[in-house]
Regions:
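N-terminal beta1-alpha1 ligand-phosphate binding loop
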Residues: 2-32
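Residues at the starts of beta-strands that form the adenosine-phosphate
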Residues: 5-6, 34-36, 111, 143
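Short histidine/acidic/glycine/proline-rich micro-motifs that form metal-
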Residues: 15, 118-124, 153-155
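Hydrophobic alpha-helical packing residues
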Residues: 25, 29-30, 136-137, 142
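A short beta-strand-loop structural module common to alpha/beta enzyme folds
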Residues: 32-44
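Helix-loop-strand module that forms the ligand-binding subsite of alpha/beta enzymes
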Residues: 41-140
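Glycine-rich phosphate/pyrophosphate-binding loop and the adjoining helix
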Residues: 138-186
Length: 186
């Protein structure tokens, strides 16, 4: 196996807004390290051995990560642009129960960061897909590296403003820079 490590961004998106945020975060991360981006429905259930940073994000539904029922409700209200059967909640449930990755590394050697999208006009309401995902990842033995980030859409279907896309790219750059610095110090 190569000594080159990489980041993996796993996201859920129904209307394309969270996918745009994930892509911007990925672009920022690529300033520091090779980075792969994959939707939750195609994400590996065992974290590859060369991944040292896992970034997970999705839309906030009913104050948390989406559920099959909240995704169905969203499908009933609007046309979705991406498959919605597997969200980040289900993907996290499918992560292998084994505490090691395919290379035998402990999950605690993989840093994680989480993000979500939320409707701007209810930004002050409690609950967040990112914070919920971080709790699950911590329980699974991953090391939460940086606080969660929320990015705001005007309505549930969007649009997402360019300022939020740019903010996501900068967050990805910062995340990559901080992670590269912590890996060097370790």
């Amino acid at each position: 196996m190569s000594d080159i490590t990489r980041a993996l961004v796993v996201y859920e998106s129904m209307y394309g807004n969270t996918a745009r945020i994930a892509s911007a975060i990925c672009a920022g991360l690529r300033q520091s390290s090779p980075t792969e981006i994959v939707p939750a429905y195609r994400a590996p259930t065992v974290i590859p051995g060369d991944v040292r940073l896992l970034v997970v994000g999705g839309p906030t539904h009913a104050f948390s990560m989406s559920r099959a029922s909240t995704r169905q409700e969203a499908r009933n209200q609007h046309t979705v642009v991406m498959p919605t059967e597997t969200g980040i909640r289900e993907w996290l449930d499918m992560l292998t129960a084994d505490t090691t990755s395919t290379s035998g590394r402990r999950r605690a050697q993989v840093d994680v960061a989480t993000f979500d999208t939320r409707i701007a006009k209810v930004r002050r309401l409690p609950g967040s897909a990112a914070r919920s995902a971080a709790k699950v990842l911590r329980r699974l033995g991953f090391r939460v590296f940086l606080g969660s980030a929320s990015f705001f859409v005007d309505e549930s279907t969007g649009p997402i403003r360019e300022v939020e896309i740019e903010r996501a790219r900068r967050w990805g750059e910062e995340l990559g820079r901080l992670h590269a610095g912590s890996a060097t110090a370790a």
